[in-house]
Amino acid sequence: METGRQYSMPSNLNNPILTEQSVLLLEDGFCFCSPEEKAFYPFSDFGVTPEDGIAEFLHQKSIVDDCQLVLFNSPSILIPSLNYDAKLVSNYWEPYASLAPTSELKSSNSTNGLVRFIYPQTKAISQKLPWINKIPAYALLYDRIIEYSQQDFNKQIYVHLFAGFFDLFITQGTRIIMANRFPHLNEEDFMYYLFYAAEQLQLSENSVKIYFLGEFDSFASYYEGVKNFQNDLHFMETSVSHLPISQDPVPFWNA
């Protein structure tokens, strides 16, 4: 078995996850990503609603097209396309989380057509940003993870760490066994949820590879914590961020 730090090298090594300039909608602000810049803007800087703040920013940048809004402020649920029924969208979502009165459920298809993503979107986004292409973050994460996962038919764990949360995908080939988001304040929180999920799925830490989406200074203690229990760590390399998490809350995401 391979041990120690490993770097995965599929065909898209170091390709950014974003293929066009994008606004990443977070809970407390947004990141603007383009090939030339990446910056975080707290909503408190605008003094208006999140949707108005984004609209104002894009107007100041004179961006009227060629931009996408990546919905990061909520995870998605994944439904196999063969089982998907558009009339049951609310039923799919109800056991997962409550839906705010200001939001509505949307769905979209994965690039490979295997799953449907169901996710909430505020009605104000549809009203105030009707022209911008909107996509759930899970759709882009899924595409990147499946590109790696389909090369190995053993079970694998993929971890996407960002400010305050981490997304956990457990896969086997092109099959998604689990996709969920968990909160974290420190490495202890992270370790608890990570190994709790692995235990629930009866995954032995020494029989499954763990992939981190990128390797970043802000999460160095998290990697070290996992290494105490699991040596077979892999990092999906992208542009490295050495900024504190307060300045780059989603370090894996670059254009």
Residue positions per predicted region:
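Hydrophobic/aromatic-enriched cytosolic interaction surfaces used to assemble or bind macromolecules
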Residues: 1-255
